[in-house]
């Protein structure tokens, strides 16, 4: 199975550096890394170029012009470049625990998509890691919040099989994985969602509508989220999402750019 790791980013190269550092030391190196870039400046391009020189797998850069928050289209651009059978998504402010890709590979199963959680880092720790260019963090590190999400205990995952079963839209796009063929069936991400919010819930909903089930990667696929101020949800995206909850494909998605 070939795995493509897609990392979303926008003008935060100091955080992307740590994400790429964590990708480089995975126990299971992805077969390729694709940066879904929503219009970053030249310093991000230079960072990616420098990492690509000695990275253990190919790094591809899917860049689009900066015309506001267009995460859905950015991810579709990255998918257009993907060669993997299985796609793992994170954001460019994520540090992956070293078993992250191996965990997602182990959890991959036909008929399912996988969502995980994340531990959060306080601002002071985030600034320290960025300044020192280090990724050595764990459950025990001071400044880690939501520590229950930093516990790597994969033998306990089966105990959480029914966790959040009734919460249809539980999950985060910063830690999700699915088969590429399933993404094609629903036409990828909905590019009509412009502005922050609902890209992931919309995708989950359409995956459910084609008959997929969800796995929850509790105690596996551990990741740490670097601190930043929260963005405001775009109310227009919410209205667009709620307008048709039964649809299986989006009108403007992956197909339009293939």
Residues covered by each model-derived region:
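Conserved donor NDP-sugar-binding/catalytic core segment of glycosyltransferases
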Residues: 99-140
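A conserved acidic beta->alpha catalytic loop
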Residues: 29, 37-48, 68, 94
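Cell-envelope/extracellular polymer assembly enzymes that use nucleotide-activated donors
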Residues: 2-4, 32, 202
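Short aromatic/hydrophobic "clamp" motif used to bind/position activated sugar donors
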Residues: 87
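A short, conserved alpha-helix in the catalytic core of glycosyltransferases
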Residues: 171, 175-187, 194-213, 218
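Acidic helix N-cap motif at the loop->helix transition within catalytic regions
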Residues: 17, 42-50, 99
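Glycine-rich, basic loop-to-helix element that forms the pyrophosphate-binding segment
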Residues: 65-82, 99
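Short, acidic, metal-binding catalytic loop of nucleotide-sugar glycosyltransferases
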Residues: 21-30
């Amino acid at each position: 199975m070939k795995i493509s790791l897609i990392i979303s980013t926008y003008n935060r190269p100091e955080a992307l550096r740590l994400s790429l550092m964590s990708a480089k030391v995975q126990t299971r190196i992805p077969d390729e890394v694709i940066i879904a870039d929503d219009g970053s400046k030249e310093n991000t391009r230079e960072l990616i170029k420098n990492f690509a020189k000695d990275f253990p797998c190919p790094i591809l850069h899917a860049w689009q012009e900066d015309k506001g928050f267009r995460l859905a289209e950015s991810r579709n651009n990255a998918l257009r470049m993907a060669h993997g059978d299985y796609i793992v998504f994170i954001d460019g402010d994520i540090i992956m625990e070293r078993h992250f890709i191996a965990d997602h590979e182990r959890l991959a199963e036909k008929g399912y998509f996988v969502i995980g959680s994340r531990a959060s880092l306080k601002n002071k720790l985030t600034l320290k890691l960025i300044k020192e260019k280090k990724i050595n963090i764990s459950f025990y590190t001071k400044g880690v919040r939501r520590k229950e999400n930093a516990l790597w205990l994969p033998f306990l995952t089966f105990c959480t099989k029914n966790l959040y079963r009734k919460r249809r839209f539980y999950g985060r796009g910063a830690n999700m994985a699915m088969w590429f063929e399933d993404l094609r069936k629903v036409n990828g991400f909905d590019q009509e969602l412009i502005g922050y919010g609902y890209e992931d819930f919309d995708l989950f909903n359409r995956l459910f509508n084609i008959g997929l089930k969800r796995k929850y990667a509790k105690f596996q696929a551990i990741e740490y989220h670097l601190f930043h101020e929260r963005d405001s949800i775009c109310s227009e995206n919410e209205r667009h999402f709620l307008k048709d909850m039964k649809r299986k494909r989006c009108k403007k998605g992956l197909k339009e750019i293939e």
